[in-house]
Amino acid sequence: MKRVYAREDLCIGCRLCEIHCLVQHSRSKRIISAMMCEQDRVTPRVKVEQSGQVTFALQCRHCDEPRCLEACPTGAIYRDPATGAILHDADRCVGCWMCIMTCPAGAIQRGREGHVASKCDLCQGQDVPACVHNCPNEALVFEER
């Protein structure tokens, strides 16, 4: 299965991955509208972290044995049988945050709405996730390892 991998040595912390993720998951799919006009602004599913001088993008690892999936009491976190990606069904999420507490990567967060979790979905339906496609330094790669 292809996954997104961060290359910390190439990340400059520009946060374009966050912006393009937000736009990809917005209603309008337009940067200005998504960032400034939409009332129900979505949460970027990737976040840039910094540790000392090192910056890197953090997103769901789509684990082979996902703790979040095992911990979810409603089945809102599930594995897509076709792609193997670990996905989230917001309609089934009750906001118990078990997925957030059990994720070893810290890659699941509360959505802006506050009552459901938010995580990377690998931009389902796209050949390459928006964060990878728009990274100016190729600090994010989408590949099988």
Model-based region annotation:
Residues 1-145:
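Non-ligating segments of multi-cofactor redox enzymes
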